UniProtKB/Swiss-Prot annotation:
The keyword Ion transport does not apply. Changing residue 147 to A: Associated with higher levels of pregnenolone production by lymphomonocytes and with increased plasma levels of cholesterol-rich low density lipoprotein. One of its GO terms (biological process) is positive regulation of apoptotic process. It comes from the Eukaryota. This is Translocator protein. InterPro entries: TspO/MBR-related_sf, TspO_MBR. It comes from Homo sapiens.
Length: 169
């Protein structure tokens, strides 16, 4: 049997896996495209995103471990809280390919709204199991509100732009 820290570490690191896959869309051409877009003055510098997302993914991953542990593993009771978590995480991981890969700012905004709703539902479900796990999601919910607002502003201010060229209306 594995030492108790192994599942804790696995759950904590798991959310970052999708981040690594999605990050390939945030390099090279995707970044050049993004650099050419109109952005509000309050948008964060690029170097902030790695530490912020790394911290948020680690917190939500550890929270999922707390829920898993409290419910005795992948039991019937864990289906809703861990299912909601998995769903919001998949939606979260879909954002970089939608925004940077397909350059679909409007659909990326829809994705973020879905992520936010699923993350809020996850927080409520987790609170019933482990208030600490739910509290670990609070910074994530705040960041989602910020990034959703940022995505909206970028979409609004660049409506009709794709790849540096104006699209026909």
């Amino acid at each position: 049997m594995a030492p108790p820290w192994v599942p804790a570490m696995g759950f904590t690191l798991a959310p970052s896996l999708g981040c690594f896959v999605g990050s390939r869309f945030v390099h090279g051409e995707g970044l050049r495209w993004y650099a050419g877009l109109q952005k509000p003055s309050w948008h964060p510098p690029h170097w902030v995103l790695g530490p912020v997302w790394g911290t948020l993914y680690s917190a939500m991953g550890y929270g999922s471990y707390l829920v898993w542990k409290e419910l005795g593993g992948f039991t019937e009771k864990a289906v809703v809280p861990l299912g909601l978590y998995t769903g919001q995480l998949a939606l979260n991981w879909a954002w970089p390919p939608i925004f940077f890969g397909a350059r679909q700012m409007g659909w990326a905004l829809v994705d973020l709204l879905l992520v936010s709703g699923a993350a809020a539902a996850t927080t409520v479900a987790w609170y019933q199991v482990s208030p600490l796990a739910a509290r670990l999601l609070y910074p994530y919910l705040a960041w989602l509100a910020f990034t959703t607002t940022l995505n909206y502003c970028v979409w609004r201010d660049n409506h009709g732009w794709r790849g540096g060229r104006r699209l026909p209306e």
